[in-house]
Amino acid sequence: GKTTLVKQFSKEFDYFISLNLEKEDADLFRKFDNVGAIWQYLCLKNHIVQDKNKSVLLFIDEIQEEPIAVAMLRYFYEDLPYVFVIAAGSRLQSLTKKHLSFPVGRVEYITLRPFSFLEYINAKHGEQWATLLRETSVPEVLHNEMLAEFNTFALIGGMPEAVTEYLNTNDIERLSPIFNSLLKGYNEDAEKFAKNIE
């Protein structure tokens, strides 16, 4: 989902740095007390020559795991305006329990959701079908085919990896490992979230 999307987007930049704050990367925000020092360290570690003419994307994943990183977002914006930062997390709502908020006026929010049926139709059949579905009632001649598509979509669900695999293979049986991985991820997130509630 979000990580795949960010990696695709990173191809638009000269440099890409990815941090995961569920791992040892969180220590970085405890070791250094300002974004300048963090940035210098990241450039050295990633063999990046600091050049304001080169575009850089910094991806901070699971930012809710390190409240200091959330607070520092403001300073990335103010002190390093040439560094583009994407912060993401699967449980950002946990920040409100810690009485932390993202810097006002310096953060844009984007919510990722699973594919809708309309997006699925657009991906599978193109904009013409999506426009037909959006703007008119489905002609009788396409009704059964559209109903079959809806039934397939209901079986696949809207998670991007599952939709992509199905569109590439047209084989629902190949989705089983993807569903198992998603289920495992949901279970792990539920356990982490439950620990935060306690």
Q: What is the predicted function of each stretch?
A:
Residues K2:
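Conserved lysine of the Walker
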Residues L5, F9:
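Hydrophobic positions on the alpha1 helix immediately C-terminal to the Walker A/P-loop
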Residues L19-V56:
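Short glycine-rich substrate-engagement loop in P-loop NTPases that contacts/grips substrate
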Residues Q50-A69:
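Conserved P-loop NTPase "ATPase switch" module shared by AAA+ and STAND
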Residues F59, F84-S90, T111, Y120:
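Structural recognition of the conserved hydrophobic beta-strand(s) that form the central parallel beta-sheet
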Residues D79-L100:
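Sensor-1/coupling segment of RecA-like P-loop NTPase cores
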Residues Q93-Y109, I121-G126:
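Short regulatory helix/loop adjacent to the ATP-binding pocket of P-loop NTPases
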Residues H125-E198:
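Interdomain hinge/linker elements that couple catalytic modules in large macromolecular machines
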